[in-house]
């Protein structure tokens, strides 16, 4: 989970239209939020990921569901309120169900900074406080089959790839052409842990704080005078979304 920025409210969702949709929902319970002018900007906001688990959406069986942060049956007047709607994977949406976030608060990625409530260790989420604990439980963020195993598989693959690049840099100083190719590949691989990609909070945490490969790569590239502004920017971006352990 990473902090999200709410995009501008769709022009189509006027106060009049919002009242109309709320009344329709109250009358017949229809899915009034299933409008392309609502779902498209929500997906764009998260780069086609679940706002909670960061699982990829609209791929294979992981289709987007619209989560009402304040549950639609408990807070009917907010059924299409902009800022109450989040793109969600089925697992998170089903598990959260009718959880009352006002009675038992959970992290709202639109309003909260996840690192204030959660940290990651070995591809699993841990609580910093009660709100963090509620979040893990309400969303099943540590479900092994749905989330932990996929996160770890990707994380280990990225580390193995970076270790191969590090080994190539340590064997001997590459030719300028080979060096440029290696640096570009390192940048591309590190960017896979960034906010546009799946499981970015977990992967950035693993790369920066759990695996030694990032520190060794940085040291080697600095020694070769190849650690540049782009690599520094990538590292800072990963730091901004990582959820390191307070230990």
Predicted regions and their residues:
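Short, charged surface segments at domain edges that flank catalytic/cofactor-binding sites
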Residues: 3-49, 73-80
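Short cysteine-rich loop/turn motifs with clustered Cys
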Residues: 37-63, 89-92
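Generic hydrophobic, helix-prone segments enriched in Leu/Val/Ile
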Residues: 4, 17, 21, 132-142, ...
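Conserved, surface-exposed functional patches that form binding/active-site neighborhoods
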Residues: 96, 100-181
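C-terminal, charged low-complexity interaction regions
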Residues: 146-247
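Histidine-centered nuclease catalytic patch
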Residues: 55-87, 96-117
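Short, surface-exposed, charge-dense and proline/glycine-enriched linear segments
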Residues: 84-99, 127-140, 204-212, 231-234
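Short, Lys/Arg-enriched, disordered terminal segments
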Residues: 1-8, 242-247
């Amino acid at each position: 989970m990473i902090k999200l920025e709410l995009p501008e409210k769709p022009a189509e969702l006027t106060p009049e239209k919002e009242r109309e949709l709320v009344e329709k929902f109250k009358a017949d319970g229809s899915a009034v939020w299933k409008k392309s002018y609502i779902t498209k900007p929500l997906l764009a906001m998260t780069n086609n990921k679940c706002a909670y688990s960061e699982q990829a959406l609209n791929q294979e069986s992981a289709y987007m569901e619209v989560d009402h942060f304040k549950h639609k049956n408990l807070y009917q007047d907010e059924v299409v309120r902009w800022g109450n709607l989040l793109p969600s994977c089925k697992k998170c949406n089903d598990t959260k169900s009718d959880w009352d976030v006002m009675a038992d608060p959970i992290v709202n990625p639109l309003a909260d900074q996840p690192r204030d409530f959660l940290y990651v260790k070995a591809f699993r989420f841990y609580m910093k406080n009660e709100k963090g604990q509620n979040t893990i439980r309400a969303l099943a963020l540590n479900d092994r089959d749905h989330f932990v195993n996929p996160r770890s598989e990707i994380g280990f693959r990225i580390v193995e790839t970076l270790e191969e690049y590090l080994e190539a840099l340590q064997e001997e100083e590459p030719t300028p052409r080979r060096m440029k190719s290696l640096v570009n590949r390192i940048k591309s691989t590190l960017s896979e842990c960034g906010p546009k990609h799946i499981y970015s909070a977990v992967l950035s945490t693993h790369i920066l704080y759990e695996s030694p490969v990032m520190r060794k790569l940085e040291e080697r590239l600095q020694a070769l005078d190849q650690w540049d502004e782009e690599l520094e920017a990538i590292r800072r971006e990963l730091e901004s979304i990582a959820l390191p352990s307070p230990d």
